[in-house]
Amino acid sequence: MSIKPKRLVNAYEERMLEFLQTCLDGTYKIHTQVSLCQFCELDSNLDIELKKFFFSSSVDALITNSDYKPCLVVDFQSSYHDYPEARERDRKKATLLALAGVPLLYSRIKEFGLLQLYSQNEEVIFNLFTGERRENAKALIQKYCGLSAFINV
């Protein structure tokens, strides 16, 4: 029996993390593959299914402020997330993050070279090749990071 190290992120996640880094100033830190239970506290009134999910789920990217308090979660979506089981997990994760007051953005490659950043309320599509609408994508990320200053964190 042998155990070997492996990469923490795939190529898509690596590109997304690099993009996020360019959108933030030195005040914020990006953490990858962080368990929900590392940055959210459990409420004893949570239903059993959400409790189980809470302890077994992680986020793709957690952005924290300089005090390491959560500001924003970015979930990297692939076509895998179109399956009903994955949608249910995404729904549970969104519910838990909403209860914790941590904003959530999704990112997804829509078509070759087009990156979609979206929440329940808004969306930005950014062209990775031409840079068109990059400032809009950056502003959306910064807006959600800034919202955390007003949220119960």
Regions found by a protein language model. Give the residues of each.
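Nuclease catalytic cores
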Residues: 1-21
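Active-site metal-binding core of divalent-cation-utilizing nuclease and nuclease-like domains
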Residues: 6-8, 31-69
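Short, well-structured alpha-helical interface segments that form or flank functional binding sites
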Residues: 11, 15, 56-57, 88-92, ...
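Long, low-complexity, intrinsically disordered polar/charged segments
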Residues: 12, 19, 23-26, 54-84
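Hydrophobic, Leu/Ile/Phe/Ala-enriched alpha-helical segments that form helix-helix packing faces
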Residues: 16, 20-24, 97, 129, ...
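Conserved RecA-like helicase motor-core motifs
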Residues: 29-31, 105
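Basic, amphipathic alpha-helical patches used to engage nucleic acids or provide basic targeting signals
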Residues: 67-120
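Basic, glycine-rich
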Residues: 101-153
